[in-house]
Amino acid sequence: MLENYIERNIFRKVYLCEQLFEFQEIDIEQTAISLRVTTPTILHDLESLAECLEYCIKEQVREKHKYKLVFKHGIALSELTQFLYGQSYFLKFLSYYFNGIFTSTELADLEFISLSKVYTIKKIVLDFF
């Protein structure tokens, strides 16, 4: 049910993280095909993933069609996926909703995003119920 509400880029990052954690290397084009997105989308997601998880990356190599990522010893996959899901605006706003913080201006100030984006995400959260 949540998969209908959480942002697609978050799901892609989690999937890429899981694949790289398990296999340490992925084929960029095959991954793009299996996720039904373009190769530049996968490359952008990989770049974003490496940027936000740089504190736990031991080695990162990009070749023409392959991408290799080795995580530091002692890093748990659950820690990585929890961090990635924590970047979801939907989940953040859901948390704010349960904590009684749901005015548009408060949310815009807390997340440093536009009111337009806040209205869009608030609608998604309210549709969830």
Regions found by a protein language model. Give the residues of each.
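Short, basic/aromatic recognition patches that contact phosphate-bearing ligands
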Residues: 1-129
